[in-house]
From Swiss-Prot:
Residues 1-41 are annotated as: Disordered. GO terms for cellular component: membrane. The chain crosses the membrane at residues 136-161. This is Transforming protein STP. GO terms for molecular function: zinc ion binding. A zinc finger (unnamed) spans 122-135.
Length: 164
């Protein structure tokens, strides 16, 4: 049976009327309108599962997808999960982070996908690059400050000995 213009499944792609495809899931916290989501890749880090890339504190998230090890992030109530069900738990997450539960276990180095709000997180590769750059800049800045302090102390000692 043919469908008329404007009649269609709301989950269909909107490319027919020129609109780009978007996520039509709405949050259950009273937010009106669709919220865009961006897939973010997290890597398992050893036996503790994925870490929260936003805060980089090294604390595993306490949402267990497998016995004995956390393997998922959870965010605001009612976000869509990859399996289609909605997340029903609410963990305290840093401001701006809103991710959903991910099922499955992986060994060290395996990838797991988490959906986060657009703009709240960078990809892990960008963070690692920024982290390395930040460390290099910090170390160079500390070295420059130490060298300047040594030069100032040396000049002060030279001036003091010349006055004597």
């Amino acid at each position: 049976m043919a469908r008329g213009l404007g009649e269609g499944d709301p989950q269909e792609n909107d490319e027919s009327n020129g609109d780009p495809p978007h996520n039509t899931d709405e949050r259950s916290d009273g937010d009106d309108g669709p919220t865009p989501y961006l897939p973010v890749t997290l890597l398992n880090a050893g036996p503790f599962g994925p870490y929260n890339p936003y805060c980089l504190l090294g604390h595993p998230v306490q949402e267990s997808g497998c016995p004995g090890r956390p393997t998922a992030l959870s965010g605001a109530v009612g976000l869509p999960t990859p399996s289609g069900s909605r997340s029903s738990s609410h963990l305290s997450t840093p401001v701006g982070l809103s991710a959903v539960r991910v099922s499955g276990c992986g060994g060290a180095g395996s990838e797991e996908h988490v959906y986060a709000e657009v703009g709240s997180l960078h990809s892990e590769h960008e963070q690692e690059g920024d982290k390395c750059t930040d460390c290099s800049v910090t170390i160079l800045l500390l070295l420059v400050i130490i060298v300047l302090l040594l030069i100032i102390i040396g000049l002060m000692l030279v001036i003091m000995f010349k006055k004597m």
